[in-house]
Amino acid sequence: MLLIPAIDLKEGRCVRLRQGLMEEATVFSDSPAETALHWFKQGARRLHLVDLNGAFAGVPQNLPAIKDILAAVAKDIPVQLGGGIRDLKTIGQYLDLGLNDVIIGTAAVKNPDFVREACKAFPGRIIVGLDAKDGMAAIDGWATVTGHHVIDLAKRFEDDGVNSIIYTDIGRDGMMSGVNIDATVKLAQAVRIPVIASGGLTGLDDIRALCAAEKHGVAGAITGRAIYEGSIDFAQAQQLADSLD
């Protein structure tokens, strides 16, 4: 079970949002590169970046911070990024910078053909991020809940060639209320590619529950607020996950 620290970027700083609201941002660091190095030293084997401004603007907005992070850690561990990725040119630019994978979110739901095109152009490098409320996909920074069921979308994107799915239960993210294990397992059982859980991780009990779900295809978990506020010690949590594998 891979635990992946999240670094959410807003105006060049490392923040966490509550329920996806930009006005509900808590600043944790003015130096995202130092934050990335910290998690690497704590034993992180992959990092998850989100360009929050980019997600709302539809184009990259935090390139200096992203470049600094990649300069600090990309030679040692893979880094993935989402937020504002709407075209193939942006994907190519990001991969050229040294990102290992890019995550397509809102654009995947609005324009599923874009995912197929991206997988053809950059095979093995595309992840789709699906955010859901009560099983239905949400888009535009969670502002809109669609009529598309996440399982139907995940199956389509699997056929298109994405390497994994990141699943966020938007009722849980940033609320420290526990991971929605049942919904995550249900999605993982519906596809053959790995599913990464995101949203709501609170403590070691969540780690144990996720490890128990690994046999169903839940390959990892992205953690944010819990490791920044200290309810989870990242190094301890990754050691626990490794011991349960």
UniProtKB/Swiss-Prot annotation:
Pathway membership, UniProt: Amino-acid biosynthesis; L-histidine biosynthesis; L-histidine from 5-phospho-alpha-D-ribose 1-diphosphate: step 4/9
Recorded GO CC terms: cytoplasm
Record-listed E.C. numbers: 5.3.1.16
Biological processes per GO annotation: L-histidine biosynthetic process; L-tryptophan biosynthetic process
Leading EC class: isomerase
Family indicated by similarity: Belongs to the HisA/HisF family.
Designated name of the protein: 1-(5-phosphoribosyl)-5-[(5-phosphoribosylamino)methylideneamino] imidazole-4-carboxamide isomerase
